[in-house]
């Protein structure tokens, strides 16, 4: 099972890594550097994990919809920067930095992720 690994340091670079390499790739990120891990890119079912210096976010593609993992019901929209772009995101969907990678490491049982975690419309 492979994952696309994108890093902005400061320019964008991308490579394919094995799921077993995700934890080490995450740990090797220099301080202050953004990364995105994408499983099953451009397919009906996909998982995208953006890791930022202060937080992570997880987006799931499933059943022709996108879902953002949430850890609270706080729907206040906040401005965030992911990679080189600015977004607004529900505060309750901003996760602890390590959590995104922990979710990604469970992707081999993709369907169970939808039931194990809480999700908001993405």
Annotate the PLM regions.
Residues 35-37:
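Short conserved beta-strand and strand-loop elements enriched in small hydrophobics
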Residues 1-33, 55-122:
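Acidic, proline/glycine-rich low-complexity IDRs
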Residues 40-56:
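Short, structured protein-protein interaction patches enriched in aromatics and acidic/basic residues
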């Amino acid at each position: 099972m492979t994952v696309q690994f994108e890093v902005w340091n400061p320019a964008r670079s991308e490579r394919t890594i094995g799921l077993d390499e995700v934890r080490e790739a995450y740990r090797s990120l220099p301080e202050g550097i953004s990364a995105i891990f994408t499983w099953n890119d451009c397919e009906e079912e996909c998982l995208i994990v953006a890791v930022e210096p202060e937080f992570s976010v997880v987006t799931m593609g499933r059943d022709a919809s996108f879902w953002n993992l949430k850890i609270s019901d706080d729907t206040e929209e906040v401005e965030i920067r992911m990679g080189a772009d600015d977004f607004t995101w529900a505060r309750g969907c901003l996760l602890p930095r390590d959590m995104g990678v922990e979710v990604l490491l469970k992707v081999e049982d993709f369907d169970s992720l939808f039931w194990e975690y809480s999700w908001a419309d993405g």
